[in-house]
A protein has these predicted regions:
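ATP-dependent adenylation/nucleotidyltransferase module used to activate substrates
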Residues: 1-148, 159, 168-169, 255
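AMP-forming adenylation/ATP pyrophosphatase catalytic core
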Residues: 34, 116-348
Length: 348
């Protein structure tokens, strides 16, 4: 079995648990980003941490250079999406194209039977024999959302040793194994964007920023100008105060709509952000499809709360209104704890 080792505590423990269980284990770290990183993954130091943990565990460690594939499938997609007014989740695209496509393919070609990762989710078998992706025991760390694009074919080759553990248990196991990563902080933010330059600094020079005008969502009154509509996000409050400070209202104001084509965005109150309909793109099914009219649970962001909804092929109707999800984010569909499928959000 080949363990994808990021250099963090989770994948370190995944490798340790599998080895202790008697599996023939090797580790591999993907070199994905050629630039600097300070997010806690994708850096030179992370590769070194993974190598040293593998040495501690007494397993072979490989390094796969997938920088070209990462740039083409994840970074370029991230840049192009922003240029077109979408806000993608690069971790989901990395899982889709790198970890569970390119990495899995490399592992199988090298003769491994399966791969394992340190994600917090569970892979189980249904009574019919198909593979099921389910939420982790640790609901605060559950990562089934970012794995919701996986097909049954990928699930059949995936082992997730941490799905039945709490994060605190994982750190304790790492400490008991004397792993150098036992106290290493979790990775944060987008791995290929340094915190000192942020999203604006990263996109500057990679896309053409579109200046735009802010309008009041109810009165259509012109409120001010923004340098880049691509850098606005739905629900944003910071950075729009200059245009909204003269409004005679004590309520908080949010970006409620962004229209790149007409170079405008609207600002309104929280109620103007709430929606009950979310338009979906093509659905990727995990192991079964849904009939229109099916009642499901949906999750619209990595840390979002589940919401009951009715599924209608190209859209969902939410039982309770929620904040508008940004186009380009992912809608994960659940029945109970089981992931049924997912789709890119087109509009809301």
């Amino acid at each position: 079995m080949l363990v994808a080792m990021s250099g963090g505590v989770d994948s370190s423990v995944a490798a340790g648990l599998l080895k202790d269980a008697g599996h023939d284990v090797e580790g591999a770290t993907m070199k994905l980003w050629g630039g600097d990183s300070d997010s806690g993954c994708c850096s030179v130091s992370d590769v070194e941490d993974a190598r040293r943990v593998a040495f501690q565990l007494g397993i072979t460690h490989h390094v796969f250079n997938f920088t070209q594939e990462f740039n083409e499938s994840v970074v370029s997609h991230y840049v192009a999406s922003h240029q077109n007014g979408y806000v993608p989740n690069p971790c989901i695209e990395c899982n889709r194209h790198l970890k569970f496509d390119v990495f899995l393919d490399r592992a199988l070609r090298l003769g491994f039977d399966a791969i394992a990762t340190g994600h917090y989710a569970r892979v189980e078998r249904s009574p019919e024999g198909s593979f099921i992706l389910a939420r982790a025991k640790d609901r605060l760390k559950d990562q089934s959302y970012v794995l919701s694009m996986l097909t049954n074919k990928a699930l059949s080759k995936l082992v997730l040793p941490l799905g039945h553990l709490e994060k605190s248990e994982v750190r304790q196991i790492a400490k008991s194994l004397s792993l150098r990563t036992h106290a290493k902080p979790d990775s944060q933010d987008v791995c290929f964007i340094k915190s000192d330059i942020g999203r604006k600094g990263f996109l500057d020079g990679r896309i053409s920023f579109t200046p735009g005008t802010l309008y009041d969502s109810k009165t259509n009154e012109k409120l001010g100008e923004v340098e880049s509509l691509e850098l606005l996000t739905l629900g944003q409050r910071k950075g729009i105060s200059a245009g909204t400070s003269r409004l005679k209202t004590p309520t908080r104001r949010f970006v409620t709509h962004i229209d790149l084509d007409n170079r405008r965005a609207t600002v309104g109150e929280l109620e103007d952000l709430m929606v009950t309909t979310v338009k979906l793109g093509r659905i990727t099914w995990c192991n079964q499809s849904l009939e229109p009219g099916s009642v499901v649970q949906v999750q619209l962001s990595a840390h979002g709360q589940p919401n009951s909804a009715v599924f209608y092929d190209s859209y969902i109707e939410l039982e309770e209104p929620c904040r508008k999800p940004a186009p380009g984010q992912t809608c994960a569909l659940y029945i109970g704890d089981i992931v049924v499928g997912s789709s890119t959000i087109l509009a809301s």
